[in-house]
């Protein structure tokens, strides 16, 4: 098979509805827009959320909370994700980013204790849960808490 021979699966592509092209087509005359009124006009219709003049839901409900601009956001990973490294490797957030264990480092990396760790590693510059520290040290590794 060549690139120019590729075809969509049978029945997966529907022909577009061509409206306003004569009464014989079944979609002539009013082109599926009914009779007169706001929705029959060009550009007709109401904006999203408009409820006919009634106070809309998004304005009836009160505002709640705020965004703390000082909040620290951490990317969390589990200890079993660290098994891709060799024994004795020094792991930092930069190394995790480089090896694509994490896609971005926001305000840091937090390592959680889900799963098992089989490698002895030195982990620096991260935050840890208690269970993660226990598992890293049980595997013969070291933890340097920030």
UniProtKB/Swiss-Prot annotation:
Record-level GO cellular component terms: cytosolic large ribosomal subunit
Keyword set includes Signal: no
Gene3D superfamilies: 3.100.10.10
GO molecular function: rRNA binding; structural constituent of ribosome
Comp. bias regions, Gly residues: 21-31, 42-52
Annotated region (Disordered), positions in chain: 1-54
Domain of life: Bacteria
GO annotation (BP), single: translation
Keywords: Ribonucleoprotein, Ribosomal protein, RNA-binding, rRNA-binding
InterPro entries (alphabetical): Ribosomal_uL15, Ribosomal_uL15/eL18, Ribosomal_uL15/eL18_sf, Ribosomal_uL15_bac-type, Ribosomal_uL15_CS
The family this protein is said to belong to: Belongs to the universal ribosomal protein uL15 family.
Subunit annotation: Part of the 50S ribosomal subunit.
Protein name: Large ribosomal subunit protein uL15
Species of the source: Clostridium botulinum (strain Eklund 17B / Type B)
Lineage: Bacteria, Bacillati, Bacillota, Clostridia, Eubacteriales
């Amino acid at each position: 098979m060549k690139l120019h021979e590729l075809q969509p699966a049978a029945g997966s592509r529907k022909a577009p509805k061509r409206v306003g092209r004569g009464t014989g087509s079944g979609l002539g005359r009013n082109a599926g827009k009914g009779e007169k009124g706001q929705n029959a006009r060009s550009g007709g219709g109401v904006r999203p959320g408009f409820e006919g003049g009634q106070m809309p839901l998004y304005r009836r409900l009160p505002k709640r909370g705020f965004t703390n601009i000082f909040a620290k956001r951490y990317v969390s990973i589990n200890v079993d994700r660290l098994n891709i490294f060799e024994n004795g490797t020094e792991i930092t957030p930069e190394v995790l980013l480089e090896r694509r264990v994490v896609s971005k480092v926001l305000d840091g990396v937090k390592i959680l204790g889900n799963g098992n760790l089989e490698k002895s590693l030195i982990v620096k510059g991260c935050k840890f849960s208690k269970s993660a520290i226990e598992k890293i040290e049980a595997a013969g590794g070291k933890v340097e808490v920030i």
